[in-house]
């Protein structure tokens, strides 16, 4: 089983914000694969299904971003999943808007949701897909990531969510190396 986690903050006021692009990626993946992500368990909205004949659990933690590790730790302990079968999708301000960076493992960088996950799982040895949301030229970083995409960036981000979904599907079916080669940008 693969655990596919999109990071974000719960609540309507955070819908469609840069920081919730991980949730949006899960929504797109769920739609493409006819999986309902509605069941509340393990402090997350979850949906079980298959991708390319492989069992997956799609997850949107409901703990707020900086505590995402609490939800994922619950899930990993319950399902006894190898960290290599976890995929985390999240926003990254250090990558240009619309760019994907897929890695097999690594540090959290500046992302507090990833810091929580790595700290509580006690490993950074799991795949992740960073979705570029760009960086503000000026102003407060928190306001920027909790803000929405401007109209002119929305088509780019919709296409990016489509590619992120395809990257996850490829990773589940064909492995991380194939996904990295095909979708890293």
Swiss-Prot record:
Top-rank taxon, per record: Bacteria
Cellular compartments annotated: Cytoplasm
GO molecular function: peptidyl-tRNA hydrolase activity; tRNA binding
GO cellular component: cytoplasm
Record keywords, A-Z: Cytoplasm, Hydrolase, RNA-binding, tRNA-binding
NCBIfam families: pth
Name of the protein in its database record: Peptidyl-tRNA hydrolase
Annotated source species: Alkaliphilus oremlandii (strain OhILAs) (Clostridium oremlandii (strain OhILAs))
């Amino acid at each position: 089983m693969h655990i596919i986690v999109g990071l974000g903050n719960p609540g309507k006021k955070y819908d469609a914000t840069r920081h919730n692009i991980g949730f949006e990626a899960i929504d797109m993946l769920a739609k493409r694969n006819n999986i309902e992500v509605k069941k509340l368990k393990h402090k997350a909205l979850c949906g079980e299904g298959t991708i390319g004949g492989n069992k997956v659990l799609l997850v949107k933690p409901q703990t707020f971003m900086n505590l995402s590790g609490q939800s994922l730790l619950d899930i990993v302990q319950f399902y006894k999943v190898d960290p290599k079968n976890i995929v985390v999708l999240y926003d990254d301000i250090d990558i240009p808007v619309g760019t994907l960076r897929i890695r097999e493992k690594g540090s959290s960088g500046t992302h507090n949701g990833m810091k929580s996950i790595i700290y509580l799982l006690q490993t950074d040895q799991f795949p992740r897909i960073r979705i570029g949301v760009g960086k503000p030229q000026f102003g407060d970083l928190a306001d920027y990531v909790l803000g929405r995409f401007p109209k002119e960036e929305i088509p780019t981000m919709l296409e990016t969510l489509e590619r992120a979904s395809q990257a996850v599907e490829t990773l589940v079916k064909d492995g991380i190396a194939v996904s990295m080669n095909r979708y890293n940008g």
